[in-house]
Amino acid sequence: MVKTVKKEKTETVDVSSMIDELATKANVALKAMEDFTQEQVDHIVHQMAMAALDQHMPLAKMAVEETGRGIYEDKAIKNMYASEYIWNNIKHDKTVGVINKDEQTGLMEIAEPVGVVCGVTPTTNPTSTTIFKSLIALKTRNPIVFAFHPSAQKCSAEAARIVRDAAIAAGAPENCIQWIEQPSIDATSALMNHPGIAIVLATGGAGMVKSAYSTGKPALGVGPGNVPAYIEKTAKVKRAVNDLIVSKSFDNGMICASEQAVIVDKEIYASVKAEFEAHNVYFVKPNELQKLEDAVMNEGKYAVNPAIVGNSAEKIAELAGISVPKGTKILVAELEGAGPEYPLSREKLSPVLAMMKSNNAEHAFELCEAMLNLGGLGHTAVIHTEDEELQVAFGLRMKACRILVNTPSAEGGIGNIYNEMIPSLTLGCGSYGKNSVSKNVSSINLINIKTVAKRRNNMQWFKLPPKIFFEKNSLQYLQKMENVERVMLVCDPGMVQFGYADIVRKELQKRKNDVKIEVFSDVEPNPSTNTVYAGTKMMVDFQPDTVIALGGGSAMDAAKGMWMFYEHPDTEFFGAKQKFLDIRKRTYKIAKPEKTQFVCIPTTSGTGSEVTPLSLIHI
């Protein structure tokens, strides 16, 4: 059945036909960009960034006027960020053809477009998100079709038009950037699910993101945030409070990475509160708390009241029937805890901040976790502290993909201002937030990377002792070996019975130094683990610096096992016995000897044990 939505009172739009046309044109543009060079792509994207930057102020004005939300100056900054910071970050990215080649490994990587992108944008950051998504899409030779939030349709479309016209003037195909002109839920759904769309790049509420992931195609959807900020007792209070105000008041708190609650250690709670109050932050009185909660939250939907999103603190106070001083930047609600029973501990997307007192770091961590579990899993968590060990502990504990330290969260979370994270206006929340990405989304997420692998035969190997002496009378080398003070001689009973052990002993006694000698002569044919362990015990008791294996393969194999366990008592027989296909990749690594020399003196030829690293032990 054909779905229709009203365009005007007397005109309807065939949604199916409209989306078909957009997708068809986009795929024509995709084909046209197949043969673009990296230089062509970079020129196009640079011109787009320049055009957006040139119009950052008019676009900000349009966004504020159309949506009735946010702050003009801050939206202008966001538009500049989406143009300047994003371009600066991606301008050197290789996104066309061969992007990496390694002659040694024989591997070559080739970048290909993912295909036509469906870009869904929010009302909170409409123009900046449109600019951002357009830049990373065209940088990767992917046409993009937008579904704008209905309450920000005009300003978003103008942002798209500006970068589209600049792209076309620079050589891009005509329909490289398009958008739905009559927005509706049906149209957005039809676009996301259209077979001509390759991937969905969605920014918005949890419901919309869930829809993006339900299309059966790749999606880069990112969820909401409910960001906790912990001010620990060692923090620099003035800086921490300033960071909170800078972040929470920016664009009236509409960046999803902005703080939603501040948790403060009891030792500094009073000083933090005083610092807030000194900077035009209003603390709601106990008898005003319910009024604020009723105005800000829609508990029927367990979410913020859309009417207050992006409004000023003064406007929200007025809606709540609370009298505040002129110039109030932020409204703070002091809460006993975080969770469903404290509605103001949810995401508020406005200059309304919850504040809680923590008894210690563990209590603070628990409150932060409660915040994240209330709709903020995977997004962002902040800690202000001078304790570096606590910074690490916080990072290990919090289920958030951005852990910010001593940083304004809104400006820190989007990256590249207060840190070296990837700059982005689409922030992944990982599996915590049911997202496919955990990092800040950028151009790297919009390319397919093909790997060309040339044939390389595995290197073959064999291992020999560092020194091999042969010919008659080679045994005399024992007289000249360095660092020989205590010798453990390992052999079978026959070597003692027939005098071969004495021959070795006499050579050692010809040395200038006095050599202590201990003999283990209980090696049987095909030695067992019990024999190896018995010899190892003797070594541990005697503490030799040199081990001499005398005899056939059995004696040498047993001596190798004893040597290994003597050198590294924590070696596991179970691991050491495992087979391997490639010695460089063996699952169980045997540590190298560090304190003992090892000498093999074969009395037979055949096993080759004296020149191999292998040892045959019967279990």
Model region roles, listed by residue range:
Residues 530-617:
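Glycine/threonine-rich beta-strand-loop-alpha-helix active-site module
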Residues 5-6, 13-15, 131, 209-339:
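ALDH superfamily catalytic-core signature
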Residues 98-239:
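Rossmann-like NAD(P) dinucleotide-binding subdomain of oxidoreductase/dehydrogenase enzymes
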Residues 2-108, 136, 278:
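N-terminal Rossmann-like NAD(P)+-binding subdomain of aldehyde/semialdehyde dehydrogenases
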Residues 133-139, 199, 216-220, 236-238, ...:
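A glycine- and small-aliphatic-rich helix-loop capping segment at beta-alpha/alpha-beta transitions
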Residues 25-35, 118-119, 261-264, 349-360, ...:
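Short, well-ordered beta-strand elements within core beta-sheets of diverse protein domains
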Residues 2-23, 42, 90, 282-287, ...:
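C-terminal segments
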Residues 459-546:
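ATP/NTP phosphate-donor binding region
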